[in-house]
Amino acid sequence: MSFKSIFLTGGVVSSLGKGLTAASLALLLERQDLKVAMLKLDPYLNVDPGTMNPYEHGEVYVTDDGVETDLDLGHYHRFSSVQLSKYSIATSGQIYTKVLTKERNGEFLGSTVQVIPHVTNEIINVIQSCADHHKPDILIVEIGGTIGDIESLPFLEAVRQFRCEHPQDCLSIHMTYVPYLRAAKEIKTKPTQHSVQNLRSIGISPDVILCRSEAPLSTEVKRKISLFCNVPEHAVFNAIDLERSIYEMPLLLAKENISDFLLNKLGFSPKPLDLSDWQDLVEALCDKERQHVRIGLVGKYLEHKDAYKSVFEALFHASVPANCSLELVPIAPESEDLLEQLSQCDGCLIPGGFGTRSWEGKISAARYCREQNIPCFGICLGMQALVVEYARNVLDKPLANSMEMNPETPDPVVCMMEGQDSVVKGGTMRLGAYPCRIAPGSLASAAYKTDLVQERHRHRYEVNPSYIERLEEHGLKIAGVCPLGELCEIVEIPNHRWMLGVQFHPEFLSKLAKPHPLFIEFIRAAKAYSLEKANHEHR
């Protein structure tokens, strides 16, 4: 086989951080001059997360080729240089759809279609297709869910078969949780033992056990896990809870020397690992002595910490080159004291979303920021809120609205894109990377320092082309358009400290090592506003 595979499973509890672990391993392996590809196998029966409630699943991360994916792919992107595509994710829904389509087309020649071999063979095809497309040295495969879940069984069986076919080219990492009982002052290994027993009963013996824990594991505890789980003691690694930032994870794993173990096991020769640049970025990110800047997030799904995961991370990325310490203030658009909360912030970000709830609150936030000269950044639906607010209060069209919120509005300044009125919702939006031509002399141009960029999209509605001329006549600047049809991509509010809206999702391209330029300029504007307020108060 031309590539090696690392399979990552999780046990004991969910939310162990397998996605962060996989992303961190990718970074460490790339620092060994190896090409890495990544694949997430998700057991849920949805075809993709595109129609799932953000309160249940968190954000939907979009790839360049327009695939709606799990938020873990966002972690893969932010930590490493892996190329992500439709080959980087597969769900049970996709697998079963493919199998049933083949059955309807007669490809199984009348055989009784079963989980084994038909479903498991399709999963193996997915693994092979990812490797064939990305051509990596090492493929990291994260299996979603927890050992013991019935939904995961076909994926684990496929992994077992794949390992049997390629025993020298595969390695299994099992991630578990090792609880600490404060009352007894003891670390308990029994849950890990049972989880490994479950995995071995399926036919997969882990090569590595990675233990999440609140407290460091002693040599004695590692020896006990080694004995009862049938792995060498030096193959038991510890990932203690991170206190400052998720970006410490690669440093923690490097300290455990896990990448050297993996490389030796897979037949590679480890090289000295230099993470000094990453260490510097983490230290800068966690430096609380820098100037404090408060950013208000006026969003619909703030109760779920992962609903705007990429937005949160992009803001923190930008705080490093902006040299400030960021405080993110969640503000519910329905709050009675919305404007009071905004008045205490140095900047406002209005992220994307769908549906009528919270819409008017976002428009109120946009108006307040425009009139009070507070830096404001609108993304996707947030940009549409900026445009509708401008039409209502500057163009004097009080009934202006988006057709998503009111299909009968007399002034539909935001309308549905042509061909988007499909009854089928899954995967039918304008998705993926599209070009955007930047207007010279604009805030966007100052940020990007180029006249053509590629950004990722996920939307059905656009600024109504028939209103653009009137909006521009009243001062709104169209700072970016898609050359493929002249769709409005970026708007800016003139004579303002910094107010900009984008139809795309710049957060999907941001990394700690390469923050997105629009986020950097937004945070710099908020920092300047914070300094201005502080100087005014000291007079």
Curated annotation (Swiss-Prot):
It holds the Pfam family GATase. Catalyzes the ATP-dependent amination of UTP to CTP with either L-glutamine or ammonia as the source of nitrogen. Regulates intracellular CTP levels through interactions with the four ribonucleotide triphosphates. Pathway: Pyrimidine metabolism; CTP biosynthesis via de novo pathway; CTP from UDP: step 2/2. It comes from Chlamydia trachomatis serovar L2 (strain ATCC VR-902B / DSM 19102 / 434/Bu). Homotetramer. The gene is pyrG. Keywords: ATP-binding, Glutamine amidotransferase, Ligase, Magnesium, Metal-binding, Nucleotide-binding, Pyrimidine biosynthesis. Mg(2+) binds at residues 72, 142. L-glutamine binds at residues 55, 353, 381-384, 404, 460. GO terms for molecular function: ATP binding; CTP synthase activity; glutaminase activity; identical protein binding; metal ion binding. Residues 294-532 form the Glutamine amidotransferase type-1 domain. GO terms for cellular component: cytosol. Allosterically activated by GTP, when glutamine is the substrate; GTP has no effect on the reaction when ammonia is the substrate. The allosteric effector GTP functions by stabilizing the protein conformation that binds the tetrahedral intermediate(s) formed during glutamine hydrolysis. Inhibited by the product CTP, via allosteric rather than competitive inhibition. UTP binds at residues 14, 188-193, 224. One of its GO terms (biological process) is 'de novo' CTP biosynthetic process. This is CTP synthase. CTP binds at residues 14, 149-151, 188-193, 224. CTPSs have evolved a hybrid strategy for distinguishing between UTP and CTP. The overlapping regions of the product feedback inhibitory and substrate sites recognize a common feature in both compounds, the triphosphate moiety. To differentiate isosteric substrate and product pyrimidine rings, an additional pocket far from the expected kinase/ligase catalytic site, specifically recognizes the cytosine and ribose portions of the product inhibitor. It catalyses: UTP + L-glutamine + ATP + H2O = CTP + L-glutamate + ADP + phosphate + 2 H(+); L-glutamine + H2O = L-glutamate + NH4(+); UTP + NH4(+) + ATP = CTP + ADP + phosphate + 2 H(+). InterPro entries: Class_I_gatase-like, CTP_synthase, CTP_synthase_N, GATASE, GATase1_CTP_Synthase, P-loop_NTPase. Residues 1-268 are annotated as: Amidoligase domain. ATP binds at residues 15-20, 72. Belongs to the CTP synthase family.
